[in-house]
Amino acid sequence: MVVAVYPGTFDPLTRGHEDLVRRASSIFDTLVVGVADSRAKKPFFSLEERLTIANEVLGHYPNVKVMSFTGLLKDFVRTNNARVIVRGLRAVSDFEYEFQMAGMNRYLLPDVETMFMTPSDQYQFISGTIVREIAQLGGDVSKFVFPSVEKWLTEKVAAMGGPVA
């Protein structure tokens, strides 16, 4: 049984993330979506909110587990007995950082492989950062996120005082 880990902040989870989960879950026996605590990144959504959102969007995949983690990815990978780390590459600009991370992960976890996946064409330009910015400016994010995520974004932006004009 091959277990893979797909780590990220998922702030918020986008259609691009779901596309990668759908495709990776068809390759591996179990795919663990690791929602990183990442307080240093100052996430828009709390860890609990991001876990809830991920479970709402991904809960129908029978071989996908959504879990949070803090600390080093290597420890999360070991805890889940994973043999593969899945990472998405949207553009060449992602590659340099991801390549460095894959090298460090290989050093820390010599028996674990990193698998890069590119998004489907319609999702290549989507990022959580861009989606958050559009939502905070009152724009339509419905093509980039699922309806439940759009609702979360709308409510969060409203709680922060509404869209920035």
From Swiss-Prot:
Which Gene Ontology MF annotations are present?
Answer: ATP binding; pantetheine-phosphate adenylyltransferase activity
**Pathway(s) it belongs to:** Cofactor biosynthesis; coenzyme A biosynthesis; CoA from (R)-pantothenate: step 4/5
Site (Transition state stabilizer) found at H17
Compartment(s): Cytoplasm
Q: Which Gene Ontology cellular component terms are annotated? A: cytoplasm
Query: For ATP, which residues are the binding ones?
Result: T9, F10, H17, G88, L89, R90, E98, Y123, Q124, F125, I126, S127, G128, T129
Q: Which reaction does it catalyse?
A: (R)-4'-phosphopantetheine + ATP + H(+) = 3'-dephospho-CoA + diphosphate
Pfam families xref list: CTP_transf_like
So where does this one cross the membrane? none
CDD domains per the record?
PPAT (cd02163)
- What InterPro entries does this protein map onto? Cyt_trans-like, PPAT, Rossmann-like_a/b/a_fold
Q: Which cofactor does it need?
A: Mg(2+)
Name the domain of life this protein comes from.
Bacteria
Q: Which NCBIfam families match?
A: coaD_prev_kdtB, cyt_tran_rel
Matching entries from HAMAP family are given as: PPAT_bact (MF_00151)
Record function comment: Reversibly transfers an adenylyl group from ATP to 4'-phosphopantetheine, yielding dephospho-CoA (dPCoA) and pyrophosphate.
The entry assigns this protein to a family as follows: Belongs to the bacterial CoaD family.
Output this protein's name: Phosphopantetheine adenylyltransferase
- Gene assigned in the entry: coaD
